[in-house]
Every structure is written in C-alpha cells, then in structure tokens.
Amino acid sequence: MFSIVRKKHLLENMSHFSQLPEFEKELSKLSKKYRSLEEDLKKLERLLIINPVGMGNNFITTHDEPLVKIVKTRLACKSLRNRSMRVIYAYHDDEVTFVYIELYFKGDKENEDRERIAQYLKNNLF
C-alpha cells in the first residue's frame, strides 16, 4: 500500500501536461459550446496521474513504443449528458509527460486525425 501511495505522490509531482497548438484551438472552440469541458479535462488529468495509459474499455492504446504511447480515450463531459468527447494524447514514460494531441466530439467527427498523430510521432521519436 505504501509503495502505491509513494508512486502516486511521485507522479503527481513529476507529471507534466502540455498541448499541441491544434488541440488548444479545438479546446477553445469546444469550451464555448460545452461549458464543463475544461473541468472535465482536469478530472481526466487526475485520473491519468494515477494510471497514465488508463484502464478499461474507455482507453485504447493506438501506438505502443518503449518511449511513447498514443492513447485514445473517451472523456465524459457533463455538458453532453450521456455522450462523450474523444481525447488523443501521448504519454512519454521516460519523462512522465502527457501531450494532448486531439480533442473532438464523436457526433461531429467519426475518427481521429491519423495524419496529425503520425506527424507528432515523426517529430518526437527521432
């Protein structure tokens, strides 16, 4: 039990969240329409500190390398009631950093922008 609490404490103090410029634009646009979105994103961050790649059916690892994992997750948004947003993020295990890549409402867009993910990986793996 002590080791779990210690690990959580270390992750809380070491973890860092950042966003791609495209993500910031999407967040700004969607936050105007869905007022609870920023608060919901903070809840996701608290969850990711405990379990960086998530658990259960709401988290799908789409790219898994030793240094970086790309994860697609369902974000419950209070403003949407029974529906949800999708968040694509990169988790850098060596640095304990999270980079938000994409945010979209499943009702507006069917799938993630794979070109953006590929570009992110190209720029950050080499």
Placement of each model-derived feature along the sequence:
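Basic, Lys/Arg-enriched alpha-helical interface segments
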Residues: M1-R81, D94-V96, K106-F126
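Short, surface-exposed coil-to-beta transition loops
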Residues: N82-V87
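Conserved beta-strand segments of the P-loop GTPase G domain that flank and frequently precede/overlap
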Residues: I101-Y104
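Short, well-structured beta-strand
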Residues: Y89-H92, V99
